[in-house]
Regions:
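Active-/binding-site microenvironments in catalytic and ligand-binding cores
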Residues: 2-233
């Protein structure tokens, strides 16, 4: 691509020196779950609701709706303030912190949790964004919450910290087990400024190394935010 400027506007044009195959040398994978009335939320969290405010069918000059849902709905990022007092929020992380070298790891469907032993065997590098694709991905087709989902064990989280990762993600609503009232996995990761991405849609995700881009809504001082997440090969 060739970049040109017209006033303050940047324009991108195809570079005639590059072939079509070169321009299409990479593929983008959307790892974001759609948000709708069927979106599963953690028990007690606000459910998604949409209400028409203006409608062309009702004689208005435009369509407009009001959306209501929690900030941890669907695919979302947890910031340290989610579980820690006086901790960092969305305002404290630049967008470039939320992108970089990634590793999507397939966890065998027979595994009920992500264990320290399993993590220790993975080719994880310092500053990696690590996503775990588990049997949870099959739950994305269900519209009811289940307590029996694959979670990350505390010693596995500690192993991830030892390896120096910067972001950890999983394909269900929480990295902690359902009955973990103390949320020790959240606290272990977030107290070390390892951000968490939950609710990933990994059914068609590429397994292995890729570039990952996490783009939360630009709302300041939040403990968590819905995000669009993509992988590039």
């Amino acid at each position: 691509m060739i970049r040109a400027k017209k006033g303050n506007e940047e324009m991108f044009h195809a570079d005639p020196s590059k072939s079509e195959s070169q321009d299409a040398a990479f593929k983008i994978y959307d790892l974001t779950a759609a948000i709708s009335e069927k979106t599963v939320v953690f028990p007690g969290d606000p459910e998604y609701q949409i209400q028409k405010v203006c409608s062309l069918e009702e004689g208005h000059t435009f369509n407009l709706c009001h959306m209501h849902f929690g900030n941890h709905t669907g695919t979302h990022v947890d910031f340290p303030a989610h579980v820690l007092k006086d901790a960092k929020t969305s305002s404290d992380y630049s967008i470039d912190h939320l992108m970089g070298s990634g590793l999507i790891i397939q966890v065998p469907d027979s595994e009920k949790s992500v264990t320290r032993q399993f993590v220790s065997e993975q080719p994880i590098l310092k500053n990696d964004i690590v996503f775990f694709k588990t049997a949870n991905s099959m739950l994305s087709k269900q519209d009811k919450f289940t307590e029996k989902y694959v979670y990350i064990e505390l010693d596995a989280a500690e192993e991830l910290l030892k390896k120096g990762v910067k972001i950890v993600g999983i394909d269900y609503i929480s990295v902690d087990r359902y009955d973990a009232e103390d949320l020790l996995v959240h606290k272990s990761l977030l107290s070390n400024e390892v951000l968490i991405v939950e609710g990933l849609e990994l059914n068609n995700a590429p397994i292995g190394r890729c570039e990952i881009y996490i783009m939360p809504l630009n709302i300041p001082k939040m403990d968590g935010l819905p995000a669009r997440v993509v992988a590039k090969l």
